[in-house]
């Protein structure tokens, strides 16, 4: 979805220059910048695209990594093949990884120094996110047992899709008990803007609410 919102034409058809391909091909810094890093609709923000097909790579990443990257730790690939090559070209590098328990997520743990976890207050989503957070130490141990190093300096939870409702306030209070000082004070509100701006491939900052079809909120 980040690819679609930031540069929607990169989400149409087959995209070969994705993060997953860059990880496996271990291209040079120059090739990364020339072929994989793409400018977006937002000035000063670049993106390496992702695609649906990357999920198939994730499902068999260990096999592919052993074939294309013999001798390299499969959980260090993102850090060594992409982040280390680009870290001096950008002030911030954001890794947008879903909570799927696969090699891509574990690569994200190794490559990141700060981990942000959005927590929706809806009961089922809230419960599953807390379960995910509960499993983090186990996932970190699994990654380090494989020979990788977790260098995370901080892990923050924050509320997302929150409205002025009593059950949402209760969820926020519970998350504060779980995270303590490691909870961001700022929350993302439940807003039609987040759902509708994508229809025009805009953002909540670039699209005027009065142009949301069928909704004025």
Language-model regions, residue ranges each:
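P-loop NTP-binding core
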Residues: 1-217
